[in-house]
Amino acid sequence: MTIRQHLTLSGILKSVESRIGERCIRKTIDGQNWFIVDENHLVHLKCVQSDNINCLVVRHAKSAEEIHMAEDGGHFYPEDYHTVDEMIRAMLDEVWNAISA
């Protein structure tokens, strides 16, 4: 990952976390920032490498006790979006749509 890619993904991650933090409680569990979206849903965002391509992932858990069994939701690749705002909106949609699922 180049420095530019890292800064871009890091910036996107922080922006999404900030927007989720406006509506949800942030809680540190096992050294990771999780957001309590509702009583049955926690989310965690992370940067990963998938198929040698860097992307952001939204992880889902049903409770703090179950974060070790968290499931990866959407994988968000920067090259799939025309703008940073479009990628941020897609990630936020993943989080908010999970509430109604």
How would you describe each model-predicted region?
Residues 4-7, 81, 85, 92:
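N-terminal export/targeting and maturation segments
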